[in-house]
Regions:
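Charged catalytic cores and adjacent phosphate/nucleic-acid-binding surfaces used
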Residues: 1-250
Length: 250
Protein backbone atom coordinates (compact mmCIF):
# COMPACT_ATOMS: atom_id res chain seq x y z
CA UNK A 1 0.00 0.00 0.00
CA UNK A 2 1.63 3.21 -1.15
CA UNK A 3 0.17 5.64 1.40
CA UNK A 4 -0.64 9.28 0.75
CA UNK A 5 2.96 10.47 0.74
CA UNK A 6 4.21 8.12 -1.98
CA UNK A 7 3.00 6.81 -5.32
CA UNK A 8 3.84 3.87 -7.63
CA UNK A 9 6.58 5.83 -9.43
CA UNK A 10 8.49 6.33 -6.19
CA UNK A 11 8.19 2.64 -5.35
CA UNK A 12 9.33 1.60 -8.83
CA UNK A 13 12.85 2.66 -7.80
CA UNK A 14 13.01 -0.39 -5.52
CA UNK A 15 13.50 -3.61 -7.48
CA UNK A 16 12.58 -5.69 -4.41
CA UNK A 17 8.99 -4.46 -4.82
CA UNK A 18 8.61 -5.54 -8.45
CA UNK A 19 6.83 -8.75 -7.50
CA UNK A 20 4.20 -6.97 -5.42
CA UNK A 21 0.99 -5.34 -6.62
CA UNK A 22 0.78 -1.72 -5.52
CA UNK A 23 -2.56 -0.69 -4.03
CA UNK A 24 -3.82 2.65 -2.74
CA UNK A 25 -6.47 2.97 -0.04
CA UNK A 26 -8.37 5.86 1.53
CA UNK A 27 -8.87 7.01 5.12
CA UNK A 28 -11.91 5.08 6.36
CA UNK A 29 -12.19 7.36 9.41
CA UNK A 30 -13.10 10.35 7.22
CA UNK A 31 -16.15 9.50 5.07
CA UNK A 32 -15.82 12.65 2.98
CA UNK A 33 -12.32 11.52 1.96
CA UNK A 34 -13.26 8.02 0.85
CA UNK A 35 -12.02 7.57 -2.70
CA UNK A 36 -9.24 10.12 -2.38
CA UNK A 37 -7.15 7.09 -3.28
CA UNK A 38 -8.77 3.95 -4.69
CA UNK A 39 -8.17 0.65 -6.47
CA UNK A 40 -9.74 -0.11 -9.84
CA UNK A 41 -10.97 -3.66 -10.43
CA UNK A 42 -12.60 -5.38 -13.38
CA UNK A 43 -13.78 -8.44 -11.46
CA UNK A 44 -16.71 -9.71 -9.49
CA UNK A 45 -16.92 -7.66 -6.30
CA UNK A 46 -16.14 -10.60 -4.05
CA UNK A 47 -13.22 -11.19 -1.72
CA UNK A 48 -11.92 -14.19 -3.68
CA UNK A 49 -12.13 -12.46 -7.06
CA UNK A 50 -10.45 -9.28 -5.86
CA UNK A 51 -7.75 -11.21 -3.97
CA UNK A 52 -7.01 -13.26 -7.08
CA UNK A 53 -6.78 -10.08 -9.17
CA UNK A 54 -4.21 -8.64 -6.79
CA UNK A 55 -2.15 -11.84 -6.91
CA UNK A 56 -2.21 -12.30 -10.67
CA UNK A 57 -2.73 -8.67 -11.79
CA UNK A 58 -5.48 -10.00 -14.05
CA UNK A 59 -8.56 -7.88 -13.49
CA UNK A 60 -6.68 -5.29 -11.42
CA UNK A 61 -6.59 -2.18 -13.59
CA UNK A 62 -4.58 0.14 -11.36
CA UNK A 63 -5.05 2.89 -8.81
CA UNK A 64 -6.28 6.42 -8.37
CA UNK A 65 -3.58 8.39 -6.59
CA UNK A 66 -3.43 11.49 -4.43
CA UNK A 67 -0.47 13.61 -5.50
CA UNK A 68 2.19 12.40 -3.00
CA UNK A 69 3.40 15.95 -2.44
CA UNK A 70 0.10 16.56 -0.66
CA UNK A 71 0.91 14.05 2.06
CA UNK A 72 2.00 15.17 5.51
CA UNK A 73 5.37 13.44 5.39
CA UNK A 74 6.50 13.62 1.77
CA UNK A 75 9.57 15.83 2.20
CA UNK A 76 12.03 16.31 5.06
CA UNK A 77 11.72 19.29 7.34
CA UNK A 78 11.05 21.01 10.63
CA UNK A 79 7.54 22.39 10.89
CA UNK A 80 8.21 24.73 13.81
CA UNK A 81 10.89 26.58 11.86
CA UNK A 82 9.10 26.40 8.50
CA UNK A 83 11.93 24.40 6.94
CA UNK A 84 11.18 22.00 4.07
CA UNK A 85 14.08 20.19 2.41
CA UNK A 86 14.70 17.53 -0.20
CA UNK A 87 16.86 14.52 0.75
CA UNK A 88 20.03 16.01 -0.75
CA UNK A 89 19.68 19.20 1.30
CA UNK A 90 18.99 17.18 4.44
CA UNK A 91 22.23 15.30 3.96
CA UNK A 92 24.09 18.56 3.42
CA UNK A 93 22.75 19.80 6.78
CA UNK A 94 23.62 16.44 8.37
CA UNK A 95 19.99 15.83 9.28
CA UNK A 96 19.72 18.97 11.42
CA UNK A 97 17.44 21.96 11.03
CA UNK A 98 19.48 24.89 9.62
CA UNK A 99 17.55 27.29 11.88
CA UNK A 100 17.50 25.65 15.31
CA UNK A 101 19.89 22.69 14.84
CA UNK A 102 17.31 20.18 16.09
CA UNK A 103 16.87 16.89 14.16
CA UNK A 104 14.80 17.14 11.00
CA UNK A 105 11.80 14.87 10.47
CA UNK A 106 12.74 12.65 7.55
CA UNK A 107 10.01 12.16 4.94
CA UNK A 108 8.90 9.30 2.74
CA UNK A 109 10.82 10.56 -0.30
CA UNK A 110 14.04 10.46 1.72
CA UNK A 111 13.39 6.90 2.86
CA UNK A 112 12.65 5.81 -0.71
CA UNK A 113 15.94 7.31 -1.89
CA UNK A 114 17.79 5.47 0.88
CA UNK A 115 16.33 2.13 -0.17
CA UNK A 116 16.33 2.66 -3.94
CA UNK A 117 18.58 0.51 -6.09
CA UNK A 118 17.61 2.22 -9.34
CA UNK A 119 18.62 5.76 -10.31
CA UNK A 120 15.33 6.18 -12.19
CA UNK A 121 11.91 4.56 -11.70
CA UNK A 122 11.16 1.57 -13.90
CA UNK A 123 7.64 0.21 -14.21
CA UNK A 124 7.75 -3.56 -13.64
CA UNK A 125 6.42 -5.80 -16.38
CA UNK A 126 2.71 -6.33 -15.89
CA UNK A 127 2.37 -3.57 -13.31
CA UNK A 128 -0.85 -1.61 -13.87
CA UNK A 129 -0.95 2.10 -14.52
CA UNK A 130 -2.37 4.79 -12.25
CA UNK A 131 -3.99 8.21 -12.42
CA UNK A 132 -3.57 11.26 -10.20
CA UNK A 133 -6.82 12.82 -9.03
CA UNK A 134 -7.81 15.81 -6.91
CA UNK A 135 -11.11 15.43 -5.01
CA UNK A 136 -13.86 17.48 -6.67
CA UNK A 137 -14.69 19.46 -3.48
CA UNK A 138 -11.07 20.66 -3.36
CA UNK A 139 -11.24 21.89 -6.95
CA UNK A 140 -14.51 23.66 -6.20
CA UNK A 141 -12.94 25.08 -3.05
CA UNK A 142 -10.14 26.68 -5.04
CA UNK A 143 -12.45 28.12 -7.68
CA UNK A 144 -14.94 29.52 -5.18
CA UNK A 145 -12.39 30.56 -2.51
CA UNK A 146 -14.33 28.65 0.13
CA UNK A 147 -13.77 25.65 2.37
CA UNK A 148 -14.37 22.21 0.81
CA UNK A 149 -16.98 21.68 3.53
CA UNK A 150 -18.70 25.03 2.99
CA UNK A 151 -22.34 25.19 1.94
CA UNK A 152 -21.59 26.77 -1.43
CA UNK A 153 -19.05 24.08 -2.33
CA UNK A 154 -21.15 21.17 -1.11
CA UNK A 155 -24.22 22.48 -2.90
CA UNK A 156 -22.49 22.63 -6.27
CA UNK A 157 -20.73 19.31 -5.63
CA UNK A 158 -24.05 17.48 -5.31
CA UNK A 159 -25.51 19.34 -8.27
CA UNK A 160 -22.59 18.17 -10.41
CA UNK A 161 -22.87 14.58 -9.19
CA UNK A 162 -26.59 14.59 -9.91
CA UNK A 163 -26.03 15.86 -13.44
CA UNK A 164 -22.88 14.08 -14.56
CA UNK A 165 -22.72 10.87 -12.55
CA UNK A 166 -20.18 9.80 -9.94
CA UNK A 167 -17.10 11.84 -9.07
CA UNK A 168 -14.62 9.56 -10.85
CA UNK A 169 -16.64 9.73 -14.06
CA UNK A 170 -16.80 13.51 -13.90
CA UNK A 171 -13.10 14.02 -13.16
CA UNK A 172 -11.89 11.51 -15.75
CA UNK A 173 -14.42 11.01 -18.53
CA UNK A 174 -16.92 13.82 -19.09
CA UNK A 175 -15.91 15.78 -22.23
CA UNK A 176 -14.39 19.18 -21.49
CA UNK A 177 -16.77 20.87 -23.92
CA UNK A 178 -19.72 19.60 -21.87
CA UNK A 179 -18.14 20.86 -18.66
CA UNK A 180 -17.52 24.27 -20.24
CA UNK A 181 -21.06 24.47 -21.60
CA UNK A 182 -22.70 23.74 -18.25
CA UNK A 183 -20.16 24.97 -15.69
CA UNK A 184 -18.08 27.56 -17.50
CA UNK A 185 -14.62 28.07 -18.95
CA UNK A 186 -12.80 28.28 -15.61
CA UNK A 187 -14.14 24.96 -14.40
CA UNK A 188 -13.35 23.25 -17.70
CA UNK A 189 -9.80 24.61 -17.58
CA UNK A 190 -9.37 23.26 -14.04
CA UNK A 191 -10.40 19.76 -15.12
CA UNK A 192 -8.22 19.94 -18.23
CA UNK A 193 -5.19 20.76 -16.11
CA UNK A 194 -5.94 17.96 -13.68
CA UNK A 195 -6.18 15.43 -16.51
CA UNK A 196 -2.85 16.67 -17.90
CA UNK A 197 -1.20 16.80 -14.46
CA UNK A 198 -0.58 20.53 -14.87
CA UNK A 199 -0.94 21.39 -11.21
CA UNK A 200 0.91 23.54 -8.68
CA UNK A 201 2.41 21.50 -5.84
CA UNK A 202 3.82 22.63 -2.51
CA UNK A 203 5.05 19.49 -0.72
CA UNK A 204 4.05 18.51 2.78
CA UNK A 205 6.58 17.85 5.55
CA UNK A 206 6.82 17.12 9.28
CA UNK A 207 3.08 16.58 9.73
CA UNK A 208 2.02 19.55 7.59
CA UNK A 209 -0.12 18.72 4.57
CA UNK A 210 1.12 19.91 1.21
CA UNK A 211 -1.03 22.03 -1.07
CA UNK A 212 -2.28 21.16 -4.55
CA UNK A 213 -3.72 23.86 -6.81
CA UNK A 214 -4.70 23.94 -10.45
CA UNK A 215 -4.24 27.70 -10.79
CA UNK A 216 -1.28 29.97 -10.05
CA UNK A 217 -1.80 32.78 -7.51
CA UNK A 218 -3.82 35.56 -9.12
CA UNK A 219 -4.63 33.48 -12.20
CA UNK A 220 -8.25 32.90 -11.24
CA UNK A 221 -8.91 36.64 -11.16
CA UNK A 222 -7.45 36.94 -14.64
CA UNK A 223 -9.55 34.08 -16.01
CA UNK A 224 -12.66 35.39 -14.32
CA UNK A 225 -12.04 38.72 -15.98
CA UNK A 226 -12.25 36.98 -19.34
CA UNK A 227 -15.46 35.20 -18.50
CA UNK A 228 -17.06 35.97 -15.18
CA UNK A 229 -17.57 32.96 -12.94
CA UNK A 230 -20.35 34.84 -11.21
CA UNK A 231 -22.18 35.11 -14.51
CA UNK A 232 -21.71 31.40 -15.10
CA UNK A 233 -23.33 30.62 -11.76
CA UNK A 234 -25.96 33.34 -11.83
CA UNK A 235 -28.74 30.80 -12.34
CA UNK A 236 -27.91 27.87 -10.07
CA UNK A 237 -29.04 24.39 -11.07
CA UNK A 238 -32.62 23.60 -10.14
CA UNK A 239 -32.76 20.15 -11.74
CA UNK A 240 -30.21 17.60 -12.80
CA UNK A 241 -30.31 14.52 -14.93
CA UNK A 242 -27.89 12.15 -16.67
CA UNK A 243 -28.67 9.86 -19.58
CA UNK A 244 -26.78 7.13 -21.38
CA UNK A 245 -26.56 9.45 -24.40
CA UNK A 246 -24.17 11.71 -22.51
CA UNK A 247 -26.63 14.55 -22.14
CA UNK A 248 -26.45 16.69 -19.06
CA UNK A 249 -29.04 19.03 -17.67
CA UNK A 250 -28.21 21.50 -14.93
Amino acid sequence: ETGLSSDPVMNWKLSALDCYTMISNSDAHSPQKLGREANLFDTDLTYNAMFEALKTRQGFLGTFEFFPEGGKYHMDGHRKCGICLDPTATQAYKGLCPVCSKPLTVGVLHRVEELADRPQPRQPEGAPNFEYLIPLPEILSEIKSASPNSKVVQQQFWQIIGAFGNEFTFLRKVPLEDIQQHLGQVFAEAIRRLRNQQVCLTPGYDGLYGTIHVFQPGELQQLNGQRSLRATNANPPVAAAYSSKDTYQI
